[in-house]
Amino acid sequence: MPQMAPIGWLSLFIIFSLTFILFSMMNYYSTIPQSPKSQILKKSQTNSMNWKW
Amino acid sequence: MMTNLFSVFDPSSSIFNLSLNWMSTFLGLLLIPSAYWLMPSRWHIFWNSILMTLHKEFKTLLGPSGHSGSTFIFVSLFSLILFNNFMGLFPYIFTSTSHLTLTLTLALPLWLCFMLYGWINHTQHMFTHLVPQGTPAVLMPFMVCIETISNIIRPGTLAVRLAANMIAGHLLLTLLGNTGPSLSFMIVSILLIGQIALLVLESAVAIIQSYVFAVLSTLYSSEVN
């Protein structure tokens, strides 16, 4: 097959393994896992004051 | 004649006789949302929800013996195969997963790693896995034989299943399309509607096959421990 001739299977194997590793890296850094949220939200006392230095 | 039939899969995108077809494998890398920004965009949220659903599913499959982060490789495997399968449906984009080179590259090292790890570190466990639960004592020799053979052909089946599914759909579409120029106008419109339906089926098959590949490798890895 003509497209298999210039590059051998070994280099294709290395290229695809590196592609897999690249995909893994992209997915690892782009996932934002959800941390479990607490059911009871503790709302601390807030006094609303006018802003001043 | 057989090489002629499959010669539709020989891509013609070559610059200076250097075939750049395999560069379509990297297309998925451009589509995965990059993590440069703090606030997630809509694409981020969508991709994240897909990955989290898969993560929960694989974690269930791996059972209590799965360590933290053990689903990660299977989720990224799913994303690689999904993008390659799906992009191949668009015109002029090479389907890299329809070639045994890519599928064997993915399947063989995974299976080999699981087998080597299992047989070297948990030899007793691997031997007990050769006999499924609840087999009568009479059938045990045959079950060992069958399970050994099924174990050995696993990388082959993983690779060939994916490649054959991808090739079959494309081949069907190509064969239907090749008859187009010799038909009348009415039949050509029916042919086009049929081809569009096949394309929808092919997109479903692309997603399903990538899922099957990932799930099966999860199962194979969970058997080891």
UniProtKB/Swiss-Prot annotation, chain A:
GO molecular function, one term: proton transmembrane transporter activity
Keyword Membrane attached: yes
Subcellular location: Mitochondrion membrane
Keywords: ATP synthesis, CF(0), Hydrogen ion transport, Ion transport, Membrane, Mitochondrion, Transmembrane, Transmembrane helix, Transport
Main location: mitochondrion
A GO cellular component entry from the record: proton-transporting ATP synthase complex
Transmembrane region(s): 6-26
Membrane topology classification: Single-pass membrane protein
Domain of life: Eukaryota
GO terms classed as biological process: proton motive force-driven ATP synthesis
Span of the signal peptide: none
A Pfam family that the UniProt record links to this protein: ATP-synt_8
Coiled coil: none
Chain's role: Mitochondrial membrane ATP synthase (F(1)F(0) ATP synthase or Complex V) produces ATP from ADP in the presence of a proton gradient across the membrane which is generated by electron transport complexes of the respiratory chain. F-type ATPases consist of two structural domains, F(1) - containing the extramembraneous catalytic core and F(0) - containing the membrane proton channel, linked together by a central stalk and a peripheral stalk. During catalysis, ATP synthesis in the catalytic domain of F(1) is coupled via a rotary mechanism of the central stalk subunits to proton translocation.
Record text on subunit structure and interactions: F-type ATPases have 2 components, CF(1) - the catalytic core - and CF(0) - the membrane proton channel.
Protein name: ATP synthase protein 8
Organism: Ceratitis capitata (Mediterranean fruit fly)
Gene: mt:ATPase8
